[in-house]
Amino acid sequence: MKIIRVQDQIEGGKIAFTLLKDSLAKGAKTLGLATGSSPISFYQEMVKSPLDFSDLTSINLDEYVGLSVESDQSYDYFMRQNLFNAKPFKKNYLPNGLATDIEAEAKRYDQIIAEHPIDFQVLGIGRNGHIGFNEPGTSFEEETHVVDLQESTIEANSRFFTSIEDVPKQAISMGIASIMKSKMIVLLAFGQEKADAIKGMVFGPITEDLPASILQKHDHVIVIVDEAAASQLD
């Protein structure tokens, strides 16, 4: 696990984009993408770039259960607004949060991941150490699954909604086992509120109580953090 410290989120996005360009030069064709505030500066760099992404496939980590793609709180909407509208891809995959059978939807998504192995996976990290929507206690062997969101996650995400009552209580998330199959993982974290999770992820122990700690076992992880998020690493 390599740690890169940056001044701020803008610099972090630039470095993540440089890593992406290197990966593309080596033949990467499938990107695993994340939502939330952490990757926004990275997507801004992609949008500003003259690079053409129309031969690439993207697979997103997760989607809320119960939100239509037209809801401005859905992750499908987030990705279109922050990246896909400006930079079309060959194909974009996100879980269908309105699927009538969400367990079957999770299995369908696993098949998509199997058919499109992820070359470059972008991650954020939750205050409780979750990656994707894999909450503490999630099995490291889990693939795509339906998640009951913890109160801490609902509270953290409530800033994107009118009220905390509007935050969906479930999501469909790529599993930890699926994430670990990615060839390369770039995790971005900014702000003091991420410091505890970053410390636990880097120094262990490796435990399902802190899902991101499993990344210690991956062969190619780069963690991009500002000084606040890295404040407990010294």
UniProtKB/Swiss-Prot annotation:
Its cellular-component GO annotations read: cytoplasm
Hydrolase among keywords? yes
Pathway participation: Amino-sugar metabolism; N-acetylneuraminate degradation; D-fructose 6-phosphate from N-acetylneuraminate: step 5/5
Q: Please list the GO biological process terms of this entry.
A: carbohydrate metabolic process; glucosamine catabolic process; N-acetylglucosamine catabolic process; N-acetylneuraminate catabolic process
Q: What is catalyzed by this enzyme? A: alpha-D-glucosamine 6-phosphate + H2O = beta-D-fructose 6-phosphate + NH4(+)
What is this enzyme's EC? 3.5.99.6
What keyword terms does UniProt attach to this protein?
Carbohydrate metabolism, Hydrolase
Has keyword Hydrolase?
yes
- Disulphide bonds in the chain: none
State the active site. D62 (proton acceptor), N128 (for ring-opening step), H130 (proton acceptor), E135 (for ring-opening step)
* Similarity annotation: Belongs to the glucosamine/galactosamine-6-phosphate isomerase family. NagB subfamily.
Listed name of the protein = Glucosamine-6-phosphate deaminase
- Give the gene name: nagB
